[in-house]
Amino acid sequence: LLLAAVMVLSMAACAAAPATTPADTPAPAEETQTTEPAETTEAPAEETPAAEPENLTATQQIIKEAEGMTLEELAKKAIEESNGKMFYGVGNSSRGKSALPLFIEYLQSIDSSYNMEFEWQQPKNNKIFDQLTADSLKGTGTFAMTLIQDGNQIESKMVQTGILDTFIPKDWADANGTTADAYTGFLPLQTLNKVFMYNCVGDKTYDNCWDFVAEGEHGLYMDIDSEIVGKNFLYMLTRDDYAAWLKESFEALSADEQAYFQPTIAEMESEAADLGLGADGAYALAWIKLWVESYNAQTDDGPICNTLVDASAKDQFGLLVYSKLRSVEESSSVSVNNIKVAAYEDGYQGIGGYGYCHYLFVTDNSPLPWTACAFIAYMTCTADGFSAWGKDMGGYSSNPKVAEETEATFHHSIGGMAEDGTTVEFAAKNDRGYDWWTTNGKLVLEDPEYCADVAFTVGSWIEMLTKYSAG
């Protein structure tokens, strides 16, 4: 029950979005609602029943029906719709390609004659939005569904424009103690975390999140203009609760350390007021400014991890996907034990990293909407469906039942233990899990609605900062 409660709270953060039907476009919808009464003298009673159904596209009508069905009922609809056909999916994660064969096997367990060909595409360099936009111009699209990240662009480019539709599986809603009608937000497959890690071969330690923006520090980080979820992290720091975390961790610094940061914080007071931020907004802007002007931009988290776990990376740190530790190959100079996860260390103060979601959507012009809904339900409501992601540490299912089954199968919480079960071999690989990371670990969770709200204010301010250049 506790895990379910935590999950629902996190949905309000990592998956929160306006309860806007994708068919609605912001301004025209409002104009229609406000001008209609002026143009007619008919009683309002006649308008009310007609409004709701007309707002639903054909795919949204299917989704509405599908949200009342169990996975098995959806599976039967999928079998009728897609037997012998071709299924195209597109996503930021390549693992959809691994999940689809398992989904097909599941459908074959219901009807042994079922067969479906598939292709899964993973566009690079944030091109997924362009690809989905182009596909939306067709009467019937190529892509049946998508697995996509970056809540800010999803909200502004995909949902408000009616390109993508949210489907909330009944079994997922039940597991989270809610209903499709009551839940407002996007459907997250999982939350991923990027965490502060530092090379510990030397004596240097980082025991406060302000240490990462101290004088002379240059953390390894994927550039905020190449992976936009990293920019969303900075947006989120300006929200009142996360800004308060930064103030709190600042106050835990020594007087000398505070003295270094104080001028920047003071300088940001007027900026925070201009941007309409809360009482602690200056602390957030100061941290963001110091971070953007100091991080050493990298192209991918894999190379960052490879750098940090090498003994030669003494005194370096990075902010990167936690799960990258899974693929470290131990050698005389390379080891997971050459790094520490900052938030796992006793006495660490402040944010431990940030969390962002992979969201699932049906395309509004989906050629196979029932099959898309069934596939989405399979991934979010069964441990087998989530296993393509769940087999590795650092990816947390949004379904508490699936999360529990995943841990029971893969034992990520003791992933760093030796075979005897008592010796800690690699402390950093003992994944403390979603519940810990979103409480004690102080993970900053992406909120798509908040990011979209501040993208033109805080976002424009960030654009004016001068990035650090290692060259």
Each model region followed by its residue ranges:
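Extracytoplasmic ligand-binding site segments that recognize negatively charged/polar headgroups
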Residues: 85-105, 118-131, 141-306
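Mature extracytoplasmic/periplasmic domains
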Residues: 358-442
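Extracytoplasmic/periplasmic substrate-binding proteins
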Residues: 282-283, 293-365
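Conserved C-terminal helix/tail region of periplasmic/extracytoplasmic solute-binding proteins
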Residues: 52-54, 58-67, 72, 423-471
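Bacterial lipoprotein signal-peptidase II cleavage site
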Residues: 12-25
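Paired acidic/hydrophobic, glycine-rich loop segments that form the ligand-binding mouth/hinge
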Residues: 140-149, 314-322
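Short, polar/charged alpha-helical segment
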Residues: 52, 71-79, 93-115, 196, ...
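N-terminal low-complexity, Pro/Thr/Ser-rich intrinsically disordered segments
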Residues: 30-82, 265
